[in-house]
């Protein structure tokens, strides 16, 4: 089974609030370890993407730090709810990625 057919699948990396490809446009295959079949790809990120991710996190941190515990808990709860709403598809993706039937 190919994970590319799942709505949650992205072949990009999430940096600074955006889904982006690696500057090199290179990718790394994600293979089912049981069958060795390619089930997807991920960007082959390098120094540029790592630097951008670090700089973006450093820029975002003061705003996050200034939020109250209640505000942060609301954001984390929304993330938790999204995971729960999509738990079936996430479980299927993880199962395929681990080579299980």
Task: Give a label for each model feature.
Residues 1-41, 74, 78:
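Terminal low-complexity tails and localization/encapsulation signals of metabolic enzymes
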Residues 37-101:
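Glycine-rich loop-to-alpha-helix module at the N-terminal edge of alpha/beta enzyme cores
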């Amino acid at each position: 089974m190919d994970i590319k057919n799942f709505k949650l699948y992205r072949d990009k990396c999430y940096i600074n609030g955006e889904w982006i490809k690696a500057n090199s446009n290179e990718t790394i295959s994600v293979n089912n370890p049981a069958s060795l079949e390619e089930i997807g790809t991920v960007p082959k990120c390098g120094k540029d993407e790592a630097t951008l991710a670090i700089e973006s996190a450093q820029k975002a941190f003061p705003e996050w730090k200034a939020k109250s515990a209640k505000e942060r808990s609301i954001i984390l709860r929304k993330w938790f709810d999204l995971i729960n709403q999509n738990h079936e598809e996430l479980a299927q993706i993880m199962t395929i990625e681990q080579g299980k039937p």
